[in-house]
């Protein structure tokens, strides 16, 4: 165990799954297939073993937050204002953050009666490609400087204060922000914020993004496994782009498999791996819980902050 994990309790999958009474998952296999990322693997057994206990833990944190808000209201002699419960989900590119976030969205909406759950990805806070090109940082896309952190912090502040907020929409097909398209985010009961940068500290800012989160999750895996998943995803994206000239990945469909693999490997090595080791993984210990995935995508270990 490294010093980084000294203030985490390591829990095996077997131990974790026994922390929650066995119940039927509140979704079907078809629903699960529809929300998982196309290069990810997850089963209803994973939902039962990992995500139902996790949902129960989130329920404990939510109740604790509400109790504290009520007590502070009494102390300050004013009525406490209802706030959304904000969950941050971070981890590397291709590690399975989106699957975790979409699954939590369904589980929370069905576990808490009449609960509303919003899901936001920080991709929408990337600067448009034109802006990145103008600043000569298109090759740094995904790195801290490629995000509009001022807008992201404004969003978190507004949502935390119960105000709705409009954010830009990002397309993985065009690899860019979609012009004139917005996502209206409601100050729901739960707001899940997913992205590689959600635990990072903005440069020259006194506000930390983690200050806004009531619960935080880091999806982890060995670097070599993440690389394999990334390369697998890249090749599958090409298959989807074959008949769509507007798709960013269409340009690679005329290349040989060897050329494609070489290009994808270079992107991983020079961009995604550097970003992971320098900026994403160092924020791992800011999470409340770390879900570690084995090479078969199954979560085999859980680290819960003490």
From Swiss-Prot:
Q: Name one GO cellular component term.
A: cytoplasm
Q: Which residues bind ATP?
A: 91-98
Q: What is its EC number?
A: 2.7.1.33
Which SUPFAM superfamilies does this entry report, sorted A to Z?
P-loop containing nucleoside triphosphate hydrolases
- InterPro entries with a match to the protein in the record: P-loop_NTPase (IPR027417), PanK (IPR004566), PRK/URK (IPR006083)
One Gene Ontology term from the biological process aspect of the record? coenzyme A biosynthetic process
Q: In which pathway does it act?
A: Cofactor biosynthesis; coenzyme A biosynthesis; CoA from (R)-pantothenate: step 1/5
Reaction equations catalysed: (R)-pantothenate + ATP = (R)-4'-phosphopantothenate + ADP + H(+)
UniProt key word ATP-binding? yes
One annotated GO molecular function is: pantothenate kinase activity
Q: Where is this protein chiefly located?
A: cytoplasm
Give the subcellular location.
Cytoplasm
NCBIfam families per record: panK_bact
Concerning its family, UniProt says: Belongs to the prokaryotic pantothenate kinase family.
Name it: Pantothenate kinase
Q: Which organism is it from?
A: Streptococcus sanguinis (strain SK36)
Please state the gene responsible for encoding this protein. coaA
